[in-house]
């Protein structure tokens, strides 16, 4: 059976050819290897029709042009040579489009990413819509790859090398106006006239290339180029800590093209693409992509979710304000905030105002749209306006009696169908629901701070939570732009449970003489975005350590923090960044002065600050405890799958994405090797390093958590 075509050619009466892109039975247009023959057949027809005046590529999808290449193609490649051949095929196809003798215009609406932007770059002109859905970028680096269909060569020549490097090295996506300003597109128009404008452009001669700014022309020359690549290379190395080989290869390939010409550049691009596709880093990053896509499709339970028309929030503090923002501005739902005093409501409203006003200043949002989104948020000091809310999110202090009181008040003042979702980070949901008259509608919904930035939420049903309550809460989290994982109602849930021993071990090393900056630098080098001690300062030492007694009571001595250290720090009024002093000292708010380790911290905790451990030794001790606890969480069914465990660690605490998450990392080392490392550490440092039974059994049998493919579990 012949596959339905994703590319359809229609020639208008004015001799403009319209090529419509519509991948059958898919929400998003993605480029697949099998489409090459379809496009070549169309190109042949275009060349044979001497009456044609121009060509327009346009998508039939409502919200995307082409979202990139189908990543499964790369997974199907068994060798670097196969992946390289895939890149060369893409390059050849783009070259054939570019070589057409008549103007070729890309009419872009929605996501134009990766291979989609490479196709648009191969066209002679580009027009895009002013719709917020329209974004242009080359995100391949986020999968441990580089653009393989000519993007590394065409983009620098179109918009300048420094701007192109920023886009390719970071995967940064541009909005329509940014793309126009940089010369990436020739015009920005309303969606209603996109095709009309693109057709008119196609009737003209090929658009002449826009002269690059003087700065970009200087940087493209030999001297400027040498300086630029040295500076960018240094900055990139500092940012990636050498953990992402794709960034180094991007610099190498772009520089080759500029120094030796496009032919050498294309050759270097294809070879680098093939080699990068086989790296463990790319395989891990692609596994995270597939896992997160999978999680986003997971409804959480088999029951249909209830309707969601409006939400209430209890508490206008930092978390309440952040939750109100994502509910109104991402989910588009009306939000009513209740706080015991007007200042709390004002704080929450200001939180959303600050976020939206920042977008207006950066020209990412119109002032009218800001006002429209803010109008969705209202406040009250009582329960007026709460009667018909579908779901209430509680974000008050971590106090069990207070939260139980909130449940009682919501059941008294809200509708019979209203769901009560607690944002607790440590209290058992079953205890919060203990006195509820409708316990089946009580659930945990644990956000991470800052709410607008952290992608993960933990959804925690207790034993009596209904399947519909789970499904409805998952539905809300997705509308808020979050990646939800459903976890069991056990102390610490998942993320905080695997994080606590990691941070405890860092503090323990600190008390034994390791320096603050050495510990943090070791874990950043390993691949975490910040070190464990800085993380504690950022979260708030008082907040971050509150869970330790809860975990110690539930799981025993392995969760105990070094004696008296935490109390000594808190008694000295050290809360971290929020009050300007923790393990680090911080400059005045609003000033860009760098944080500095406070030398007074060492005598305060009775340490010398003259450690002997190497960076890998420091990282090993922290990370191994995290891995061990993650395996326990699978064993105790705290998480439903290792997929959720990997996603939770990467999105919740910044576990190095290039390692794929705790379970992929264990697989890459081998369970037997992890057991051997932990047994060695247990001999050196104590029983907290004893590998759990599941890990020992897997090591003995040579088992792994994942199969070899990117998406399959054992």
From Swiss-Prot:
Database matches in CDD domains: crotonase-like
Gene Ontology molecular function, alphabetical:
3-hydroxybutyryl-CoA epimerase activity; enoyl-CoA hydratase activity; long-chain-3-hydroxyacyl-CoA dehydrogenase activity; NAD+ binding
What are its GO cellular component terms?
Answer: cytoplasm
Q: What EC number(s) does this enzyme carry?
A: 4.2.1.17, 5.1.2.3, 1.1.1.35
Q: Which GO terms describe its biological process?
A: fatty acid beta-oxidation
Q: Where is this site: Important for catalytic activity?
A: 118, 140
Protein's name in the database: Fatty acid oxidation complex subunit alpha
* Gene that specifies this protein: fadJ
């Amino acid at each position: 059976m012949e596959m339905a075509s994703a590319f359809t050619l229609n020639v208008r009466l004015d001799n403009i050819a319209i090529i419509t892109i519509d991948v059958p039975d898919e929400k998003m247009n993605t480029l697949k290897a099998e489409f090459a023959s379809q496009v070549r057949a169309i190109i042949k027809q275009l060349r044979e029709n001497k009456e044609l005046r121009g060509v327009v590529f346009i998508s039939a999808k409502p919200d995307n042009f082409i979202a990139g290449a189908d990543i499964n193609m790369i997974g199907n490649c068994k060798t670097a040579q196969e992946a390289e051949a895939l890149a060369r095929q893409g390059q050849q196809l783009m070259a054939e489009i570019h070589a057409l003798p008549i103007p070729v215009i890309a009419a872009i609406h929605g996501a134009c990413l990766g291979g989609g932007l490479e196709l648009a770059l191969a066209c002679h002109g580009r027009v895009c819509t002013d719709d917020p859905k329209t974004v242009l970028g080359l995100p391949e680096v986020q999968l441990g790859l580089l653009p393989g269909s000519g993007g590394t060569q065409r983009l620098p020549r179109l918009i300048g090398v420094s701007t192109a490097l920023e886009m390719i090295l970071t995967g940064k996506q541009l909005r329509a106006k940014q793309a126009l300003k940089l010369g990436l597109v020739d015009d920005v128009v309303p969606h209603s006239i996109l095709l009309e404008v693109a057709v008119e452009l196609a009737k003209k001669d090929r658009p002449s290339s826009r002269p690059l700014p003087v700065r970009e022309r200087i940087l493209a020359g030999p001297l400027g180029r040498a300086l630029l690549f040295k500076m960018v290379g240094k900055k990139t190395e500092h940012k990636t800590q050498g953990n992402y080989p794709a960034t180094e290869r991007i610099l190498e390939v772009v520089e080759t093209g500029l120094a030796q010409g496009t032919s050498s550049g294309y050759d270097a691009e294809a070879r680098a693409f093939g080699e990068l596709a086989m790296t463990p880093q790319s395989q891990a990053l692609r596994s995270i992509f597939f896992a997160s896509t999978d999680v986003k499709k997971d409804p959480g339970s088999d029951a249909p979710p209830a309707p969601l028309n409006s939400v209430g929030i209890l508490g206008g503090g930092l978390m309440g304000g952040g939750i109100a923002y994502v509910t109104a501005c991402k989910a588009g739902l009306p939000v009513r905030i209740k706080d015991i005093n007007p200042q709390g409501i004002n704080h929450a409203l200001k939180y959303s105002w600050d976020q939206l006003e920042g977008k207006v200043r950066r020209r990412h949002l119109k002032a009218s749209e800001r006002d429209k989104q803010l109008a969705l948020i209202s406040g009250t000091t009582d329960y007026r306006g709460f009667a018909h809310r579908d779901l209430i999110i509680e974000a008050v202090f971590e106090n069990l009696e207070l939260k139980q009181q909130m449940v009682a008040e919501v059941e008294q003042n809200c509708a019979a169908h209203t769901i009560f979702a607690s944002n607790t980070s440590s209290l058992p949901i079953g205890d919060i629901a203990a006195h509820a008259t409708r316990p089946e509608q009580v659930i945990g919904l644990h956000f991470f701070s800052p709410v607008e930035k952290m992608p993960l939420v933990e959804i925690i049903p207790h034993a009596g939570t209904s399947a519909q309550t789970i499904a409805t809460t998952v539905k809300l989290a997705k509308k808020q732009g979050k990646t939800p994982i459903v976890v069991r109602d056990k102390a610490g849930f998942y993320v905080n449970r695997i994080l606590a021993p990691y941070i405890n071990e860092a503090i323990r090393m600190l008390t034994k003489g390791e320096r603050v900056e050495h510990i943090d630098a070791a874990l950043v080098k390993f691949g975490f975005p910040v070190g464990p001690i800085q993380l504690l300062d950022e979260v708030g030492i008082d907040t971050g350590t509150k869970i330790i007694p809860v975990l110690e009571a539930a799981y025993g001595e392995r969760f105990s923090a070094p004696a008296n250290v935490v109390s000594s720090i808190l008694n000295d009024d050290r809360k971290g960044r929020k009050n300007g002093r923790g393990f680090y000292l911080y400059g005045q708010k609003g000033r860009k002065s760098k944080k500095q380790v406070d030398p007074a911290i060492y005598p305060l905790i009775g340490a010398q600050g003259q450690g002997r451990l190497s960076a890998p030794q420091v990282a090993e001790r922290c990370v191994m405890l995290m891995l061990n606890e993650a395996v326990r969480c699978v064993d105790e069914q705290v998480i439903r799958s290792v997929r959720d465990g990997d996603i939770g660690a990467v999105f919740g605490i910044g576990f190095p994405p290039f390692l794929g998450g705790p379970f992929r990392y264990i697989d890459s080392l081998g369970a037997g090797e992890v057991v051997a490392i932990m047994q060695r550490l247990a001999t050196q440092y104590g029983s907290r390093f004893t590998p759990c039974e599941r890990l020992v059994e897997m090591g003995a049998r040579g088992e792994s958590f994942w199969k070899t493919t990117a998406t399959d579990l054992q």
